[in-house]
Amino acid sequence: MTKNKTKKYILYVIIFVVAIIAAFIYLNKNYIDNYYEYINKETIKDKEDGWSYIDDINKEISNDANNIAKEIINNPTTSEEKNIKEFYNEYLNIEFRNKNGLKDLELYIDKINKTTNINDFITEAIKLEKELSIELLMSKSIMKDFKTGKNILYITPIPMDYGYSSDYYSNETLTTVKNNFKLYNNKLLREYGYTAGEALDITKQIDDFYTNLANNSLKQDDLLNTEKYYNIIDKSALSKIYTNLDINKYFNELGLSKIDKLSLVDEKSYQELNKYLTNNNLSLWKNIATIKILQTYAEYTTENYETIFTKLNKKLLGKEYTREETAYDLIKQIYPNEISKNYNNKYLSDDTKNYISNLTNEIIKEYEDMINTSWMDNETKSKAVTKLNNIKINIGTSYIKDFSSTYDFDSNLSLVKNIINLNKVVRAASYEMLDTTTTTNALPDYTFNAYYDVTSNSINILTGGTKVIKDINNKYENLGSIGFIIAHEISHAFDNNGSKFDENGLLSNWYTTSSQEKYQEIQNQVIDYYNNYEIIHNVSNNGTRTIGENIADLGAMECITNILIKNNANKKDYQTTYESFAKVWANNYSKSTKVLQSLIDTHSPNEIRVNGVLSSTKKFYETYKIDSKDLMYIEPEKRVNIWS
């Protein structure tokens, strides 16, 4: 080979090597410019709008729960299971439902529409609440008193069609949702016999009322603030706010005469509601009552009403369910405890339960280490550790208070009459919880979820949540998926809301002044950090609304990263964990869906959840050799951490 040829050959080799290096750098740059996108883009690209990894798991869980319902229907052994079968048969008997029509509802609608003044209407509205469990004048929930631990009555904003606050009613992104509900109400009224013009006028009248009420109610962010919605007053104080309703008569008629102390969640909304409870607005109240009766019960009557309901679901959820599918969904809603018990027996193995228990305890131990080396002063650290060590762990909880199981379906009654009677039983039984410490599970086990309950200081890992585990022996993959989820929920014990409650789940200011000031500093930094992310171009993430969930995300990632460190994990282990974390939150949402989510969800959008957390994680930088040239890079002084 000549000297010139040798030089040319060497040059080609150099060019080739440089090209390989450049290609590697390019690929590596994509890898860390948007970690969420890099990990998930191949999965997402062929998915339909609205798809998510979690939805796929929930569909699998739902199918499993449906199969359990089928097994119960085919071979019921207990009285509760026989009720499930009776409900199913009645729901599918569309011939009898069509024949019965609205006979069981027309009586109530007629009585409401015959009232001639607001006092007569109030009398009928109270009867309506007693008979149909429809709350027109006051919405009530039974929850724990944050200071005593006993169940009390919370007076909450009255239910509206699509939200409680102006955040929903004034936002243009929700126009399609609002129009769908208006069309739904319009069709219900037309089917009942109103003319097109009458139905249009009534729909607009009700929408105008809700819009004004929402504009005079707490903002969405306020409804998430303990100080805003925990407002203990007595009945006499409520009487001074809601002057057009005889409060004593109202509570006495409902069998709640012993109630004195209660929590008024949104005083402003009831001040506004009071202005409407006059003779001048009698027609409005009649129309609200009519539409509420139809919304609540008409789907259990004729095929035409059922079709109106299923078409609304198709517009809102993107799927039109068959009658049989709807029956299974209703069974899961009405009998959550029965389905949960059977679901747990079939899908929660002892091995999985033990694995989750051990992992949860490992996470709790790591939180203790993090707390003991944190910015808290010694007094606050001691109380934080006490709270941590008193967290109750519930796996496959299945302790829903299933009041509906106490009602025996009567085959001689119509489906809608049975549902009316069942709702009365449920309402009466729920009132019996007042002034007790009875606890109920918020979610059935056939749900992909875990949650921290601040009033019982418990971490609740639903059986459906374990579906994310593919192999209990794959420690690092599980650490990034179910491990992160558990660590996230435990972190809620110390977020902006959870930190206000002690180890017994009672409202208590256990932070010293200096620790509280430092924590507020950290919260402000987290808010600013997440405000800097955009959901879509020119639409910023709301760091204030998402503060609690962002704190939980950051704390969870610190926790599982520390576990990796203590397990002497290698680079591949870190990559496995971080990739697993990113995959769980994969979704394919449209721009409008992302904006809508930001209005109603306290979590940051999933892409921000992944990239925001990892961009503040030092070990992530080391694992992927991220530097200032990469878009995932955040200057060290601008990164946020909760405990370190």
Functional labels for PLM-detected ranges:
Residues 2-16:
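N-terminal Sec-pathway targeting helices
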Residues 38-39, 156-158, 462-464:
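Active-site-proximal beta-strand/loop segments in catalytic clefts of secreted hydrolases
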Residues 45-50, 57, 164-166, 217, ...:
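Short, solvent-exposed loop/turn and secondary-structure capping segments
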Residues 48-71, 196-214, 478-485, 573, ...:
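Short secondary-structure subsegments characteristic of cysteine-rich extracellular domains
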Residues 206, 341-644:
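Intrinsically disordered, low-complexity linker/terminal regions across diverse proteins
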